Regions:
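ABC transporter nucleotide-binding domain
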Residues: 8-94
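Short, charged/small-residue-rich alpha-helical element at the C-terminal edge
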Residues: 62-136
Length: 136
């Protein structure tokens, strides 16, 4: 079955108020299709809730940015754990704490053009990997 056809039908049923139970390890599908998520390990629920709430519980620790500042310089900013160049040209910053978002915004906005600055929580895929690494 074509994945896109299945996704369309799930979203169609969802729009009609149907409850759909969907099991998948591909967290991008889960984010796209599900309102709520449950992660289970050895029969025990280890994470449960609205996908938006679950993501936000982990903090706004990701920043997506387009700027003239080099990735090397971005990686040196206090609070940046890692900087990664994405295929679309944006740079993804992994923060040690959401509070560093203010500092990073201040640094980038001092007389410099910022095409994109988006602070978000980790994706469900990142949360899944983190939880799986902890033995869920």
């Amino acid at each position: 079955m074509n994945v896109e056809i299945m996704k369309r039908e799930i979203l169609n049923q969802k729009s009609k108020g149907a409850t759909v139970i969907f099991s998948d390890h591909n967290m991008s599908n889960v984010e796209e299709l599900c309102d709520d998520v449950v992660m289970i390990d050895n029969g025990k629920v280890v994470l449960n809730g609205n996908t938006y709430d679950v993501r936000n519980k982990f903090g706004l620790t990701r920043i997506y940015v387009r700027t003239s500042m080099s990735i090397e310089d971005l990686a040196k900013i206090e609070g940046v754990e890692k900087a990664e160049l994405l295929n679309d040209g944006r740079i993804k910053l992994y923060l040690t704490s959401a509070e560093y978002g203010y500092t990073i915004f201040d640094i980038l906005s001092q007389g410099k053009y910022i095409q994109t600055f988006d602070q978000e929580p980790p994706t469900l895929n990142e949360i899944f990997k983190q939880k799986a690494g902890e033995g869920l």
